[in-house]
């Protein structure tokens, strides 16, 4: 399993992926390699997201939440799924369905906002667009993140860094942050990232 970070373009991804798969096929067990990607279809220069380059460019998930159209989110995910499959990416390290309840957290734009019910509806559509009704040869598996919710990070600091791990659930609202994850599980997300 590889997480593909920054690349100069789709043609480079395809060449690299094909060489990597050829190498894997020539090993004793011949187990294929899985290529994963963080979101790369948004027009953004955030350090948490990949530049779109040759991929289609869409608004951030927070923008999609502002529109509030579940079918638009499903169409977006289906379109991006086709792009991922074309270059060999089979795991999407998204959707990020944390609830944006800590305004200092720098990853809010990658969420569907602070409304748990809206996030749950849009996450379900997102997963359906990438995975289809069931995982199959044309699916891209979603790894929904960050359970149990990265949105309430203490002082807005990101938990990817060991110097500050901790979440705050003011008003004892931990269960509220679980609502989108319950919906993702019901939608049969392929995986969940802590």
Predicted regions and their residues:
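Glycoside hydrolase catalytic-domain context in secreted enzymes
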Residues: 1-194
